[in-house]
Design a protein with these regions (language model features):
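Signature of dsDNA virion morphogenesis modules
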Residues: 1-191
Length: 194
């Protein structure tokens, strides 16, 4: 089966992640955890924080896909692409863009924390995760009662990114074509000057 590396096309303004979707079955096969505040004061439990934490992208994780021609293949993102995607997500002010199952736009959802796992002592381990180096981890504040209820019922379990990426192989073909066209232009120009 074909394996395709997806990259960010830096010449394309639309390339990158537009939103984070909360989904029942995340393609990266990593569920988030719901963080709650459990401080007990005078025998009272404080209100829930309503924060979800989990992986947004895991580098080199093969993700199964099937296109409209019924062709099956896997995609993956390199560590470099994961880092670029996480940076562009915030540079383009997309931290308040969220959807449910990639269909319904959601209000009251914000990515409030984000980092790239850099080693074996990453803080995500404090929450029971064991992500590989280069994983983009996010924490999302949920001020949406409907979604928070879905979290508590186990109807949404993880994050899934939404965005536009280029196929590295197809991009290399485009670059080869551009090089060939430039060589042809150069030959034509040289012939015209002679």
């Amino acid at each position: 089966m074909r394996i395709v590396e997806l990259i960010i096309d830096e010449k394309d303004e639309t390339s990158g992640i537009d939103a984070v979707s909360v989904v029942e079955s995340p393609a990266i096969e990593s569920d988030f955890i719901a963080l709650k505040k459990h401080e007990i004061e005078l025998k009272e439990v404080d209100a829930e924080k309503r924060i979800l934490m989990g992986a947004a992208l895991i580098p080199n994780k093969q993700i199964y896909r099937k296109n409209d021609k019924n062709e099956e293949y896997y995609i993956y993102f390199s560590e470099e692409t994961v880092r670029k995607a996480s940076e562009l997500f915030f540079m383009n002010s997309n931290q308040n863009n969220a959807t449910l199952e990639h269909k319904q736009k959601l209000d009251g959802m914000s990515v409030v924390e984000s980092w790239i796992v850099e080693g074996s002592h990453d803080k995500s381990m404090n929450y029971g995760f064991n992500f590989p180096k280069g994983t983009w981890v996010i924490s999302m504040k949920v001020n949406n009662d409907e979604i928070w209820n879905k979290v508590k019922l186990g109807e949404v379990k993880g994050f899934s990114i939404e965005g536009y990426f280029a196929d590295k192989y197809e991009m290399s073909l485009v670059n080869e074509d551009e090089i060939l066209i430039d060589k042809i232009k150069q030959i034509i120009t040289e012939n015209e000057n002679n």
